[in-house]
Amino acid sequence: IERCAGINGDGTPLVEAFSNVDKVEIPDESTIDIYLKEADTEFLAYLTVAIVPEHVEDLEADPVGTGPFHYVSRSPQENIVLEKFSDYWDTENQAYLDKVTFRIVKDSNAVVTNLKSGTLDMYARLSSTQTAQLAEDSDFTIYDGGMNLVQALYLNNAVEPLNNVKVRQALCYAANRQEVLDMIADGKGTIIGSSMFPAFGKYYVPELSERYNQDIEKAKELLKEAGYPDGFELTITVPNNYQQHIDTAQVLVEQLKAIGVTAKIQQVEWDSWLSDVYADRKFQSTVVGVDAAYLTGRALLERFTSTSSKNFINYSNEEYDKLYQQVKTSTDEEEQVEIYKKMETLLCDDAANLYIEDMACEVALRSDFAGYRFYPLYVQDMAKIYKVK
């Protein structure tokens, strides 16, 4: 915890959420006292960080963890092999499988072939085409759930003409999100209206999904008021390793033509997206999905505060920042929930992004196995998978 907080080091926290830690004391062998600089009722959620020995030299080559499996080997761009850890601390939740191999499948067109040939026993995030190819195959069970991420056309609020709220609102009114779902996922998925998805339950505001129902005439009027009566050109940057996002961008390109916006897709490597779009913020718009690392409202909404290093869309709203500071120190759960809902509503009202959906997640599992589970966060819990034949 001290290392995560930067205590006894150079003061730089390894984990941003731990920057609030003032000191750590151990009064006895079964107790740890953590003192915070200011109240933070969500801090417990951030204690789910990995426990890693201080002097581990190469975590990439020799990972250290505390889970039900232990690391065996890794072949870059090929596979990662894990085996059951017999000394796992949670004796009531031991893994069923003795060995798990994660294979890298570079060609999405080869997924179904690999499943049917026996090379793969399981594959997550099937496309609608892949699901259709496996639907009648009794050798596989298809599990349906939410992907638990916020897919959107993320807009750089600091560049023209997207720095004009009316332009951003026009884009939102121009889109037909149900058509996006129908065309890329056979209608599966949940339309959303802000940076929150249904699995977060009490924080989620479902009515925001209807805030920008398609209205072409209203979109044109907003563009006219913003000074773009004839539309404008828009570049949509998309990482080339996510076919669902590419497909979504292609549908949006066609829809935006109705209001005079000429959009073009720029596909980039994932590393380039991380450096140029996410880190350097050199983009106009991008279609990606953003998920949460923790089960807190802050996990999805903190990134849009004006000073956050994760605020890659350059969103800036003084009221939003004030609400965030307020929710950080609130100790009343009901008040926290209401504040987070206000923050979601501001993102929607400001059309910070063109929110689309929490994408459907379909998982193929060979019928020899069972036990697959969906969680509010995107994880692959292999410890729950067991063999039935």
Which stretches of residues belong to each language-model region?
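Detector for C-terminal structural segments
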Residues: 174-202, 244-253, 274-389
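Short helices/loops that flank or line small-molecule/ion binding pockets
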Residues: 109-119, 133-137, 166, 247-259, ...
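Structural transition elements
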Residues: 190-225, 243-245
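Surface-exposed binding/hinge segments that line
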Residues: 13-54
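Alpha-helical secondary-structure segments
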Residues: 2, 29-31, 67-68, 96-99, ...
